[in-house]
Amino acid sequence: MSYRVGVDIGGSFTDFALFDEATQTLKTLKVFSRPDEPGAEVLEGVRLVGERYGIMPADITYFTHGTTVGINTVIQRKGLRLALFTTEHFRDVLEVARLKIPDMYNLLSKRPQPLIPRDLVFGITGRLKADGAEETALEEASVARAVEEARAAGAEGIVISLLHSYRNPAHELAAKRMVERLAPDIPVFLSSETWPIIREYERTITAVIGAYVQPRVAHYLGSLQAALKNAGVPAEPRLTKSNGGVMSAEQGKSQCVQMILSGTASGVIGAAYVAEISGIKRCISLDIGGTSADAAVIIDGQPQFGVGETIGEFQIYIPSVSVSSIGEGGGSIAWVDAQGVLKVGPESAGSRPGPACYGRGGTRATITDAFAALGLVGLSDIGYSAVTIDADKARAVVGELAGKLGRTIEETAEAIIRIAVSGMYSARSCRASASIRASSRASPSVAPAR
């Protein structure tokens, strides 16, 4: 037997799709994700497919998956301690950014703190013109001073992003050679190698994010490769890229910036394929997971692409499938604010403890609990037998909110669902729909992305 296996690792669940190349049939499996130990859910799934379907590790001849390790590293700010070398007098590139505030209607809204603090940003002497011609030679003494100060400040890696290096990387390459000679133990990352695009800030932040997540991603991929090999899986793991393509695990270790949005892209690519073979010209894919809901536009069977997708609090400027996300998924927590208004999300119960109805220690009502309290889930197999629904626990936590609101459990559960659906539609899907209507009068279809 020969199976092609696809694995989608989400914030709450990890889903397996197993395609039998001989019979052309599809099998599925769901396990809880392990954000505390990334990769453990993959090995658990490999074990369970053997128990449930009799598929042995040796039968897996193709293995690809999307991972959230990179994006979670940025969100949790657990990446490499970096220093940044910029062109002299341009130390504030990350501080100034594009001067946009997160909420344009809130004058108290604050921009996020950069991944590299200003005291770890060093200007070095040397300047290129806009056409790439050298204006001022690179000064080795200034590079040496920057290396010394970066090492003294505890830098674990150095990002070099100089003006106009997308036209001529000579100064960045020369600076890299100097750093490697002076501090061979410190890894160096170049903006011209990460993604050589015009505009200083966009190129710099993309290089910074790539360097920031690289050690954790590389460690994760190395561990996954070893674990799959030890389990007897002959296939070399592949990763989905942010643009919907695939890359090898070895490529992912050094080019992790290209797969940082791999999880969300996979669902859109799958939905686009279904739309194409179904003859649907224009549709919106909607991927509702445990933590978020992702909407994307598909036209003539093709997803739309762009740059500037959001990674945590920052934008990353690499080609990727255009996806709009809102923090409302099955595990999104319902709560009552100080004014007595019912809200849903963006905080999620995740996989641990998860919704109360999972019986894993959850004590706060979620969207899934609202469905369980109304009897809409839990009457048949849920999550391919990975989840057992306890409706009584769901009603108990929804009941706590009902008491605060002066409503019945049923009314409160229905309100939770209505708020979630309203948020998904008005905040994101409406914009996607508007994009479609701009190109055609035809109304779009909605395709589930998982």
Can you annotate each of these PLM segments?
Residues 1-450:
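N-terminally biased helix-coil "hinge/interface" segments that flank
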